[in-house]
Amino acid sequence: MKVLVAYMSKTGNTRKVAEAIFEEITDEKEIRSIDEVDSIENYDISFLGFPIHMEGPDKKAARLLEKHCINGRKVVLFITHAAPEDSEELPPMLDKFRVAARGANIVDMFDCQGQLDKSTRRIMSVLPSAKLRRWAKEDNSTGQPDKTRLDRARAFSRSVMDGLQDDRVEVCAESQEERDEHRILSRV
């Protein structure tokens, strides 16, 4: 099986998660910045990682997802964000990545907290959105992703790859309840 791990990372958070995922893959594999990827057509499965920007994928990330996630290609999404994983506001933001990747067979999705960049926090603190201003003020993301979160990414990668080897991978859960249950189980 040929596997691609590709990521977009401005601050290094998503790159760290990509590297943790990559470490656990024993099949033929490549890791690259998403900007270096022309196509995912020649891979059996692609792990694609992005940070959340302004409550979802930024325009570049959305375009890349729409470009690569076509024809039912098997894709695993991994997303980093400054919010804690149990944040009530997070699921709709993650859904925006699923929508952008809707042409793919989304095998699974992983998300974890990453450290909010200081310049981004300053920008968020003056935006019109009260929610974003509050997040900037209440930021608790220093040092993320930590060892525990990176270990979770490694375990997630092993689980996905084991499922593929066993031909038991299913399309990512669609209902909010199923996604919440999956997120809780993936932390255990």
Predicted regions and their residues:
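A generic structural signal for ordered secondary structure
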Residues: 4, 15, 32, 156-159
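Short non-domain terminal segments
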Residues: 5, 41, 45-48
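FMN-binding flavodoxin-like domain, especially the glycine-rich phosphate-binding loop
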Residues: 23-30, 45-188
